[in-house]
């Protein structure tokens, strides 16, 4: 039996509720896959600030680095919006990513046939969409120096090094090898020097993956093509700010952010989390959709632990639950046969995953 240590960071708002359901499903799939999980909880976000005065206590970093993976819920809320920037929950998350050395954000976007009417786009446009946005996470304009402002000007600097581009490109090509073997690198090489370097380095890395087809696209065109014909994409490789925008755009292809997981991975350890926020307005009501967090646990099994069979079981269980008409409140208007609470949806998926 394989044993894995998982750090649980439940966070704020609906975070504790959705993490509990993901753990329920992990334990269910462990029972039939000869796996065992041990969990250690840690604080981050507003809840951490309330208890310790710091949105990211050192203990949380230590627990995470001593684990095989981190399963994370969500942080933030209006309660903490007026704190100094360095004390806000979001500041803790940025520091957390830096401490763990995560540099790649993986955002899958696929469309469940059972929920095809939830999308704003026509069914014939999105049916069969299955893409992955691979976004560089700790470089680019969000972190470049110099940056600042005075009364009349503000400035930021977009910087990428060859090393940063090489490692994110390898991540994208390795993922493509397990998918449809196509990478589209997104840049703005027609006007940005940094994008010209990006494109040159990606072309160099591509030579190590001759089975993978590489194409290039300017970011403005990519934003349009995601709406016009999203099925043309398999793996979309891009930098921090472009990926920030494109991954949010791609997330709406499915029609609900409550369905979509993500991973932030690097040399040390990976963090697996839903793409949605902490939704404090519905916290404690038992109506949050846990599917994105459950699918984040599946990504954790696949990319952090190499347990592809267990991940496949969770993915199939989610699909079965949706096919049979189970819906949480956010999806109730889309062919629901039974509207479930957060806990009920977790139990249904756990039951299917255990078979």
UniProtKB/Swiss-Prot annotation:
Its main location: cytoplasm. Substrate binds at residues 97, 107, 135, 220. The record marks 142, 188 as: Important for catalysis. Keywords: Amino-acid biosynthesis, Branched-chain amino acid biosynthesis, Cytoplasm, Leucine biosynthesis, Magnesium, Manganese, Metal-binding, NAD, Oxidoreductase. Its cofactor is Mg(2+); Mn(2+). It is found in: Cytoplasm. Binds 1 Mg(2+) or Mn(2+) ion per subunit. Pathway: Amino-acid biosynthesis; L-leucine biosynthesis; L-leucine from 3-methyl-2-oxobutanoate: step 3/4. One of its GO terms (cellular component) is cytosol. It catalyses: (2R,3S)-3-isopropylmalate + NAD(+) = 4-methyl-2-oxopentanoate + CO2 + NADH. Catalyzes the oxidation of 3-carboxy-2-hydroxy-4-methylpentanoate (3-isopropylmalate) to 3-carboxy-4-methyl-2-oxopentanoate. The product decarboxylates to 4-methyl-2 oxopentanoate. Belongs to the isocitrate and isopropylmalate dehydrogenases family. LeuB type 1 subfamily. This is 3-isopropylmalate dehydrogenase. It comes from Sulfurimonas denitrificans (strain ATCC 33889 / DSM 1251) (Thiomicrospira denitrificans (strain ATCC 33889 / DSM 1251)). The gene is leuB.
């Amino acid at each position: 039996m394989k044993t894995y240590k998982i750090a649980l960071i439940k966070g704020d708002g609906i975070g504790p509720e959705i993490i509990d359901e993901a753990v329920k499903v992990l334990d269910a799939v462990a029972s039939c896959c000869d796996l065992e999980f041990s969990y250690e909880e840690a604080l981050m976000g507003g809840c951490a600030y309330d208890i310790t005065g710091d949105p990211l206590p050192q203990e949380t970093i230590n627990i995470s680095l001593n684990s095989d993976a981190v399963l994370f819920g969500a942080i933030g809320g209006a309660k903490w919006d007026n704190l100094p920037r360095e004390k806000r929950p979001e500041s803790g998350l940025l520091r957390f990513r830096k401490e763990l050395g995560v540099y790649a954000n993986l955002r899958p976007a696929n469309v469940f046939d059972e929920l095809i009417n939830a999308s704003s786009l026509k069914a014939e446009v999105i049916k069969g969409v299955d893409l992955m946005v691979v976004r560089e996470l700790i470089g680019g304009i969000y972190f470049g120096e110099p940056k600042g402002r005075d009364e009349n000007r503000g400035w930021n600097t977009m910087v990428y090094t060859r090393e940063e581009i090489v490692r994110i490109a390898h991540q994208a090509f390795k993922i493509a090898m397990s998918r449809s073997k196509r990478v589209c690198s997104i840049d703005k090489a027609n006007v940005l020097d940094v994008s010209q370097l990006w494109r040159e380095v990606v072309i160099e890395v591509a030579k190590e993956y001759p089975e993978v087809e590489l194409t290039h696209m300017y970011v403005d065109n990519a934003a349009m093509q995601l709406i016009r014909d999203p099925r043309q994409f398999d793996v979309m490789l891009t930098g921090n700010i472009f990926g920030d925008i494109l991954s949010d755009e791609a997330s709406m292809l499915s029609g609900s952010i409550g369905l979509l997981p993500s991973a932030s991975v690097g040399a040390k350890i990976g963090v697996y989390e839903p793409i949605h926020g902490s939704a404090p307005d519905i916290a404690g009501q038992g109506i949050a959709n846990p599917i994105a967090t459950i699918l984040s646990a599946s990504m954790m099994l696949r990319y952090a632990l190499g347990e592809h069979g267990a991940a496949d079981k969770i993915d199939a269980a989610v699909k079965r639950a949706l096919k049979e008409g189970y819906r949480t409140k956010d999806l109730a208007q889309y062919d629901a046969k039974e509207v479930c609470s957060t806990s009920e949806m977790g139990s249904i998926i756990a039951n299917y995953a255990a078979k």
